[in-house]
Amino acid sequence: FDQGHGHAGGHKHHDPNEELELVHAWGHQHVSGVGLELRRESTGELLCATRPRYGNGSAAGNENGFVVGIPPCVWGPPPLAPPPRVRRGELMRTISRYNASEHHTGVMGIWILTAAPVKPSTAAHAGKERILV
């Protein structure tokens, strides 16, 4: 999981064991892409799978034969699926599938992920509050 950059372009040190919840996963592929998978490297667990949508017209945003959209995976409170938890330093695997019936160059697949630090459970802190009078 990319640890990103800190403020003012410098590097900020992060705890690789910090627990995060995934919020969004946006996949990116080029023409002839047929699907992307995001998997937890240590277990092979499938975290997100998506398939590109191809245009079938001539209008802008619906160009025939071109990838015009790839739906993201989105997690959160109900009715959304619960967010997968990952460690900041955890390795992820991208599987990017392409139709190879024709020659293509520049094929690739990447994910853009957003995540949020896991907040301590409110249940874990229940009864530990102090009231000052």
Language-model-derived ranges and their functions:
Residues 1-133:
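Beta-strand-centric surfaces of beta-sandwich/beta-rich domains
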